[in-house]
Amino acid sequence: QLANKGYFIRVIVRNPNEALFLRIYGKVGQIELISGDVKEENNLPAYINGSGCVINCAATFFETPSQSFKNLHINAARNLAKAAKEGQVGQFIHISSLGASPKSDSQLLKSKGEGEQAVLECFPKANIIRPSLIFGSEDTFFNRFARLSSISPFIPVVGSCTKFQPVYVDDVAKAISSLVEDDQHERYLDLGGDETYTFKELILILLSEIKRK
C-alpha cells in the first residue's frame, strides 16, 4: 500500500534474509531491510533517523524466553515511541489488538493495553490501531496451527468459546496507509471483519481448508 504511493520504507527485522520477499513490493531501492531488534533501545535512533512516520508492528502471540509480552509489547513499544518523539518524527502508528486493556484477564491483551499506555506517555499524539485476529498468506496464527495439525494427531483448543472477528491483512494495511497519507494523529481505530467466529470454529475451518479431520 505505502510503496505503491511512492513512500520509501525502512523495515527493521532481526533476520533480513527472511524478509527479502518484501522488496518485490516496491521499486529498486524503495524498501530497505535493516538488521536490528526493536528491543535494543540504544540502536533505535539510528533505525528511525530521518523518518517522517514510524509504524510499530512488533508483536507476538506466543511468549519465548527472548520474546516475552512485557519486553516486546510494553518495553519495546515505549522505547520506540520515545525514540520517535526525541527524533522529531512527525507521526507514530502503534499496532495493538482489539480488546487490549491493562485490566484484561488475558496476559496477551493486558500487555497490549499497557503497551498502548506506554506509547501514549512518550508520544501523546500517536495513532492506535486495534485489529482483531489478522489473517493472510503468511499470518502467524493460522500457519502455526496448520503446521501443528500436520505433525500432531490432535490440536489443543483452550478457550474454545473465545470469539474473534478475523480481519484481512490487506484491510489493515489500507487503514495504516490512510493514516499516513492523510497525516492523521490521535486516532483510535478498531478493526474487525464482518463475521464472528469462536476459536473452535476457526480451527475447524482451518482443518477443512487443509483437508484434515
What are these regions (language model features)?
Residues 16-21, 25-87, 98-102:
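NAD(P)H-binding glycine-rich loop region in Rossmannoid oxidoreductase-like domains
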Residues 15-16, 195:
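Residues in the short beta-alpha loop(s) of Rossmann-like NAD(P)-binding domains
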Residues 1-12:
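N-terminal Rossmann NAD(P)H-binding glycine-rich loop of SDR-like oxidoreductase domains
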Residues 1, 179-213:
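Mid/C-terminal beta-alpha module of Rossmann-like enzyme folds, strongest
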